[in-house]
Amino acid sequence: MIKKINYNHSLIFFISCIFLSSFDYLRSNSFILICFFLILILGVSHGALDNIKGRKLIKILKIKNISYFYLVYILIGLGIILLWILFPQSLLLLFLIIASYHFGKEDSEFISKNQKQSFLLKTFKGSIIIVSPLLFNQNKTLEIFNSINFDLSNTLLVKTEFLVILLLLSFISNLILSFNKNYDEKSVLLMDFFSIITLNIFLNPLLAFTIYFCFLHSFRHSIKLIFELNKNFKKGIFLFIKKALPLTFITGIIFIVALNFLNHEFKLNESVNMVIFIGLAS
């Protein structure tokens, strides 16, 4: 059932991307606050079950108090933010690799449940999320990176030839991942690839990322979590909402407080970029 849901979802998402890209109003605006709240409500929730993973982890480590997990979880997040502020350029390559791998891995989990793909393959697959906005909307994308303390101006990531090579490698990775898979799984990978390309050709990079992150990446991961909680979809979705709501609410409060604080020192778009991307990374 989950494979059929993934196919139908990718088909609807692909058609929607083409439809949305046809509106000049959407192409000429960034919708900063709408992006912020969409990621806050829909995007953050797909990672809000980390506490369940934490409970499994402390059982393995034979730790009885869940508070230790939350303490370490918070300290890791704060540590990432601190390192980001102090050593941004040193973290740049690591950030890009981890982000690419994360997107490549989670967006292809539906076809690789019992199959191990290489780290490199999944990293190249997921690199399209970073490569496509830099290739098709470079100036605005560089503004986003600059606002989160990353300077790409002296890197290969501003060279068109290098970006085209990475884009081709991402496409080839999708073909390799789809090898020996059924028609639906092949179609999902290709529709996802061209959906992301379409979004980044026509829309502002922040809006393109928000649509991808909330309505493709987070949606697919949430569906996977729902079926892990309960094989009955209706029961699973209510259980997912119940378990995801507390951490989503807490994260939302932190994001809003951070935005309000940063907005006193920076422009609104810079503040939103910092909260979204540094917040998601941590």
Residue ranges: model-predicted function:
Residues Y212-L229:
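Predominantly late transmembrane helices and immediately cytosolic-facing juxtamembrane segments
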Residues M1-F13:
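N-terminal membrane topogenic signal
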Residues F19-L33, N263-F266:
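Short, hydrophobic transmembrane alpha-helix segments
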Residues L78-L135, F145-S153:
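Membrane-interface helix-loop-helix junctions at boundaries between adjacent transmembrane segments
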Residues D24-I32, L82-L92, N200-F209:
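Transmembrane helix interruption/hinge and helix-loop junction motifs
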Residues F13-S21, V72-I81, F103, L190-L199:
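Hydrophobic, membrane-inserted alpha-helices
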Residues K140-L157, L262-L268:
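Membrane-interface helix termini and inter-helical loops of multi-pass transporters
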Residues I97-Y101, E106, L121-T141, K159-L177, ...:
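Alpha-helical transmembrane segments of multi-pass integral membrane proteins
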